[in-house]
C-alpha cells in the first residue's frame, strides 16, 4: 500500500525476507486482485465475472465498462484515472453484478446506468481533489 504496486524488486525483497522462492511470491501476487504488478490508476475497478455475476449480466457489464473506458482488463486509461481488473467471486452474489473500487468499496447491481453514474462520480472526485501523494520513507507523506 505504500507505493500501490509490487515491482519485481519488491517481490524479490519479500521473497528474501520470508526465505521463500521469488516465484512463490510472484504466484501469490499475480493470483490475488488486491496486489498490483504495475502501477494502478487512481481508481482500480475490479468487476466480478464469475458464474453468479455472469448469469446476471456481469460479463455484459464488464464489456460495457471496457468500451466506456477504452481499455481491457489489466490496463489503465491514458489519463491514469482508471485501471480495470477482472475479479473472482466477491461474496455478494445476491447483489450481482458487483464491482469493487480500490479494494474497499463494493458496488452492487452494476447496470450500464449505474456504471455511468459511478464513472461520473469518480471523475468528479478526481477533479475535486488532487492525486494523493504516495508514501515515501516511513512516516513521510
PLM feature segments, named:
Residues 1-141:
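Signature of N-terminal electron-transfer/Fe-S-associated modules in redox systems
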